[in-house]
Amino acid sequence: MIKGVDLSAFQTDIDWDKAHKKIKYAILRATTKNNKPDALFYDRAASCKLYGIPYDVYKYMYATNQADAYEEIKGVLNLLLDVFKDNVSVIYLDVEDDSLRKLGSEKLTNLICYEANMIKEAGFKFGLYTGLSFWNEHNFNHDEVLKLQPIVWAARYPHDNKINCYPIEEDIPVGSLNPNLPNQIGWQYTSKGFVDGIKQKVDLNAFDESILSLHPKELYELFLNDVFNGESISKALESIGFDGSYEYRKKIAAVNGILGYKGTAEQNILMLNLLKAGILIKP
């Protein structure tokens, strides 16, 4: 088993020099309730790439009708397909919201399958996240969803009512406490995790090592050139045989955590300084 975390904008100010030593796999929140990118998604994706941490994404499901379901997954795909498609293998659909319980099994099953098929048709693997209690309540038809061969990531926190903090170095709970749902390879075993370098409490996950086989070994490549010319990022890129256009720089900005790239002087200087330092990531 490998240990990892799932992250959203609720975890701020991560010291990746420290945190990356313990994190073997990360799952990042892709978009918010209004289908906009998580405020720290680009930064997190760039950090994972730089530190060689395999990562996938999750989408918390709010949709109660097909139109909203379409917009939910469209928002995730719009985020991923341009820049991040080569790094993300699994899109986990987070099925746990109380509002979904009220839909009835047939309607919720249809919505899950609709979103899952959008994910698969876009070339990603469908992941299903849910809690043991939500599963046991049969809020959706398990057999129908399992036909889509989801990668299941299940939540159960057997010790959270007894502890204030669960360091990632400590052993996971004994196997008999694992939800062990069909197709499950991941277990979110606490919401009170502690990882050196992350100030806030964080969810901790234990995954079968097979999850790593879905990710390329080379997660990032840097612009490593001894000599480049030009005092602008455009000229510098062109001098080493790369595209200096705005569209290409926008892709570079995204994978390096430079948010809302507009080609401003400040953004371009930052990009140039990363290139000079030998740590500018290629898209």
State where each predicted segment sits:
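Low-complexity, Pro/Thr/Ser/Gly/Ala-rich linker/spacer regions in secreted
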Residues: 209-226, 279-283
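Catalytic domains of cell-wall/extracellular-matrix polysaccharide-remodeling enzymes
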Residues: 87-168, 173
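Functionally critical loop-and-helix segments that line ligand-binding/catalytic clefts
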Residues: 1-9, 16, 142-219
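Substrate-binding cleft of extracellular glycoside hydrolase catalytic domains
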Residues: 1-124
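Short, Lys/Arg-enriched alpha-helical microdomains
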Residues: 248-280
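Short secondary-structure transition/capping segments
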Residues: 38-41, 68-71, 138-142, 258, ...
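Extracytoplasmic/periplasm-facing segments of secreted or lipoprotein envelope proteins
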Residues: 220-243
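Surface-exposed patches in mature extracellular/periplasmic domains of secreted proteins
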Residues: 58-61, 86-91, 127-131, 248-249, ...
